């Protein structure tokens, strides 16, 4: 009786041991596959968390309307654009390739932190769903391609509000194409496939925010 109990317990334990392995593999094989996935010791742990969130919290699609506070930003779009034009020339640029080795060197791709813009900063502080840490204005000057990629963690969603754009810049997600048109916004899961293509010599400016699920 005891031996049979131990054997059955051992079988159950082995089955449970496979659960986290399957959760990691599920996260790993999502396109586009990151071939450096297992070079980061923390990534498999994030993979388990990502898979758990997909089971519990993830939706097929995300809508800005379900996060009412974000409407405040869109309503203030004209003033946010005006503030950007006034304040940004007085600030130093931070280039993406200096903050993350994933980005290719590109002097036309940089950002300004949201905290440097008083109106924007005050609005953000009124919206509880926003994670203020990474809030920024992202600027692209000239043609550019961001190849297919995805964030390491799906803990946060990604919100974008286009401040400047003439329709020459497109964001592609697993839900289709979003054209960066002035005053238009989008909310998506940036831990899933997305890429970007900009074809003209003009400037595109987007407000980027991380959103709590």
What residue spans do the PLM features occupy?
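Conserved metal-binding segment of the jelly-roll/cupin
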Residues: 179-193
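C-terminal, beta-strand-rich globular interaction domains
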Residues: 189-191, 205-212
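Fe(II)/2-oxoglutarate oxygenase catalytic core
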Residues: 8-156, 166-169, 199, 203-208
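A short beta-strand-loop-beta hairpin characteristic of the jelly-roll/cupin
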Residues: 164-182
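Basic nucleic-acid-binding interfaces
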Residues: 161
């Amino acid at each position: 009786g005891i031996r049979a109990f131990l054997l059955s317990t051992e079988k159950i334990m082995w089955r449970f041991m496979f659960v986290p392995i399957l959760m990691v593999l599920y996260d790993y094989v999502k396109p586009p596959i990151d071939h450096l996935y297992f070079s980061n010791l923390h990534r498999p742990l994030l993979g388990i968390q990502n898979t758990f969130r997909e089971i519990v919290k993830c939706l097929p699609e995300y809508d800005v309307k379900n996060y009412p506070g974000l409407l405040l930003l869109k309503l203030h779009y004209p003033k946010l654009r005006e503030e950007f034009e006034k304040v940004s020339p007085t600030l130093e640029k931070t280039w993406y390739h200096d903050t993350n080795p994933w980005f290719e060197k590109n002097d036309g791709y940089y950002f300004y932190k949201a905290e440097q813009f008083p109106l924007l900063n005050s609005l953000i502080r009124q919206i509880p769903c926003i994670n203020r840490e990474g809030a920024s204005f992202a600027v692209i000057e000239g043609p550019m391609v961001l190849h297919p990629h995805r964030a390491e963690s799906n803990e946060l969603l990604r919100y974008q509000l286009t401040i400047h754009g003439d329709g020459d810049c497109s964001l592609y997600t697993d839900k289709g194409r979003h054209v960066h048109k002035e005053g238009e916004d989008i909310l998506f899961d940036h831990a899933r496939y997305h890429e970007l293509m900009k074809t003209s010599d003009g400037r595109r400016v987007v407000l980027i925010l991380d959103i709590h699920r």
